[in-house]
Each structure stands twice: as structure tokens, then as C-alpha cells.
Amino acid sequence: MTAFENLTWLHGKPQGNGLLKANPEDFVVVEDLGFEPDGEGEHILVRILKNGCNTRFVADALAKFLKIHAREVSFAGQKDKHAVTEQWLCARVPGNAMPDLSQFELEGCKVLEYARHKRKLRLGALQGNAFTLILRDVTDRDDVEKRLAAIAEQGVPNYFGAQRFGIGGSNLLGALRWAQSDAPVRDRNKRSFWLSAARSALFNQIVSERLKKPDANQVVVGDALQLAGRGSWFVATAEEITDVQTRVDNKTLMITAAMPGSGEWGTQADALAAEQAAIADAPELQSLLMREKVEAARRAMLLYPQKLSWNWWDDVTVELRFWLPAGSFATSVVRELINTSGDYANIAE
């Protein structure tokens, strides 16, 4: 398996170096749920600005403030502790009375707004995230400038970030040990992290192998194509290659790659053969996913950052702004721009 830092680059390996996240203010994330609170219901949506706190810690503190069980507070996704982030928490508080959440106090946190809502906020129930990143000590401004222009047009590989695999790849190592053992894993969190790491690593490998080909974004017979922004997909036949290629070129269709597991992967013919060959040297991880009945799925091969803009503060410092759909990784954008030191795994998804 190829390590995250060595996965194939869409625009070639960056020429310059730089520093990501010299301080928390260099990494700003604003969660976009894609909807507004209902204004009524037994739940309360709370928008929090935080710095230096992880999401679970804030959720537990909010539950304590409201005098409810911690399981009654939910969120759509984890946000990085060492960053400036805005996100929504959801607390189940039946009744007509509205608690005064302006009195909620926690170091590094501030309540921005809150309102009643009819439904529980569930994990993954967000549209995306808006990012503002500061890259410092950039050694090759011209190369970064060219890459930003290329990314705006051609996107980046939609890799799962190193965060998915844990510090030092610990989650993937856990999955490999589990795959080599018949012993059950009782800890639900470990099960989830390890299975997710296994499937994500296989997806990354499939994408990385395809991107080694100069015509990687050319549709082949049997490719599974996804409507942009949608989860549904269909298989390309020989008769419709020309038509679907036009739609891929104008970004209304996306070529997908397998997230292996039990059941059919979705691709057929040449495309299926290529995916199987890409991960032929990882039979243990594939067997683990099938043994644990993790269903196979599809994910777009490329990621197109939306609302991408940048501003050079000076020759070595650039501010980036972009929006990514849920499940995408800002670090997969940054790795196409600069080589960075340090472990991306300490940046929450």
C-alpha cells in the first residue's frame, strides 16, 4: 500500500515547501449544514465558535450546562481541536422553554446563535465546509500560483486524508493486525476507525494507480459514473463513451473509484479489472472488509474545490479560501500545492 505522502499527484509533485497551520488561526473551518433551524421542535441547534477544544469535549460541556445526558448532544462531524472552527451542536431539550445559552461558558468557545429544530442532527448530516487556510514560508510562489490555477480548472485527487489513518498510521496498522487475527474487536470506536481506515486506504490506492496514467480522466468501458453532487451512479457502456466523456469534461459527471467491501463494486469490464489489479497486493484488508460485512461503495475520483480564491500577503505567505463537500479533505488540496513537514494525521477531518 502506498503511504499518503507518496500517493500520485494530479499536477505532479510540488516543487516548493511550506508550512501548514503554524498556529490555530491559520486553519479556519466553517461548517455548512445546508439548511436553517426550523424554529420549533424538541431539539436546539447551537452554533459554536471554538479554538483549542475538540468537538466531543464541547458537546459534553454543553450537556452538563443543560443538565442532560451526554448522548442527548449530537453533531454532524468532528472539527479540529487546534484550529478556529464554527460548527453546530444539537441538544435534545423537550418543552417550550428556551434555555439561555448565552450563559454557556467554556474557555476557547463562544455561542454564536441557537434555535429550536425538529430533528436530531446526525453524523454526516452536513453539506460541506468552508475553509480559510494560511500557508507560510512558501519557497516557490510561482509554482504554487500555477498549481492554484490548475486546481481551479482540473481539481485534485479526492483522497481520504492522513487523518483517516491515525497518528503514524495507527488505525491502518490496527486494521492489518485485526485482519491477521480471528479475535473479535469489542471496542466499537476501534472497529469503526480500523474498518474506515482499511476501506479508505484501498480507495486511495485505486485512485493513485489510475492517476499514474496520462489519460486517467478518460472514461473506459465499465466505469461507474456519478452525477456531480449526487450519490447515484451508472455504468458506462461502449456505445455511450463519447457522450459521457463530454459530460465528464464539463464536470456534470464524475468518474468514481471503489471503496471496496462486500457485494459488487459497481464497475465492470476494463474498469473493474483495473481496480482489482490496483489493490491485488492487499488481500488481507479486502478480506477483513468482507468478513465484517462492510458494504462496497463508490466515491468520486476527483475533487473540485468550489469558490476557490487566494491572496498573497507577501512572497512567502498565501491565504486560501475554498469550499468542499462533506467527506472531503482540505489536506488533499494542500498536498497538491506544497510539500509540508509534520503529520497531517493530527488535523481532524
From Swiss-Prot:
Q: Which reaction does it catalyse?
A: uridine(13) in tRNA = pseudouridine(13) in tRNA
What Gene3D superfamilies does the entry give? TruD, catalytic domain, TruD, insertion domain
| Keywords assigned by UniProt, alphabetized | Isomerase, tRNA processing
* Example of a GO MF term: RNA binding
Q: Which Pfam family is an annotated match for this chain, by its short name?
A: TruD
Q: Where is the TRUD domain?
A: 155-303
Annotated function:
Responsible for synthesis of pseudouridine from uracil-13 in transfer RNAs.
Q: What is this protein called?
A: tRNA pseudouridine synthase D
